[in-house]
């Protein structure tokens, strides 16, 4: 499932993040690449230990924790600290798949990458190209979202970023280990939760059907979750 999650950051928060990011020191993007990704990757990135990356990353994680749609879709157990990249002048990232396990450098903190996320930090009309293209059995899905919006997709997906031919694309990217490992199970829970919320808004939280469906949701989560 590929999902657009709007408004993770407000426009004011995006501006604050960009003010810090634009004055930071960027390095070659292959600093975090696996062997396959390094062959395809041409961009720049903030080092993982950068104070700016930590400060802006903490703000993003705080925003994610307050966003009910993100929680419902991802059911996060662990979130890898957000990283940051930028593309301009034809820079691109060819087709690749993300590493299954991400290790935070200098620590023993590991994340199984069930989900990948990209949070856009530049408005789409400010640059040409730079589309995130995610492949699945139904074809190729493209994302180029407003600043502050996030796209969430299975980390097992082949994906690429098209060349940026005008302007600059700035984004944060990170991985999530979900409480529910299987993408199909997680998608089913998300669909069920979405319908429960809609029915609750219409009938009220004390409606017998709402209560019954909520019980089914939690029993399925209990069956499938690692916590």
Curated annotation (Swiss-Prot):
Q: Which GO terms describe its molecular function?
A: 2-oxoglutarate-dependent dioxygenase activity; iron ion binding; L-ascorbic acid binding
Record keywords: Dioxygenase, Iron, Metal-binding, Oxidoreductase, Vitamin C
> PROSITE patterns attached here?
FE2OG_OXY
The catalytic activity of this protein is classed by the Enzyme Commission as: 1.14.11.-
Q: Which biological process terms from the Gene Ontology are attached to this UniProt entry?
A: DNA damage response; intracellular iron ion homeostasis
Cite the binding residues for 2-oxoglutarate: 169
For this protein, the parts annotated as crossing the membrane are none
Matching entries from InterPro entries are given as:
Oxoglu/Fe-dep_dioxygenase_dom, PKHD_C, PKHD_hydroxylase, Pro_4_hyd_alph, Pro_4_hyd_alph_FE2OG_OXY
Positions binding Fe cation in this chain are: 96, 98, 159
Which domain of life, per UniProt? Bacteria
The yes or no answer to whether the keyword Transferase is present is no
Report the cofactor remark: Binds 1 Fe(2+) ion per subunit.
- In this chain the Fe2OG dioxygenase domain maps to 78-178
* Cofactor or coenzyme needed: Fe(2+); L-ascorbate
Q: Which SMART domains match?
A: P4Hc (SM00702)
The keyword Transmembrane appears for this protein: no
- Sorted alphabetically, which Pfam families does this protein's record hold? 2OG-FeII_Oxy_3, PKHD_C
- NCBIfam families xrefs: PRK05467.1-2 (NF003973), PRK05467.1-3 (NF003974), PRK05467.1-4 (NF003975)
Protein name (Swiss-Prot/TrEMBL)? PKHD-type hydroxylase Bcen2424_4810
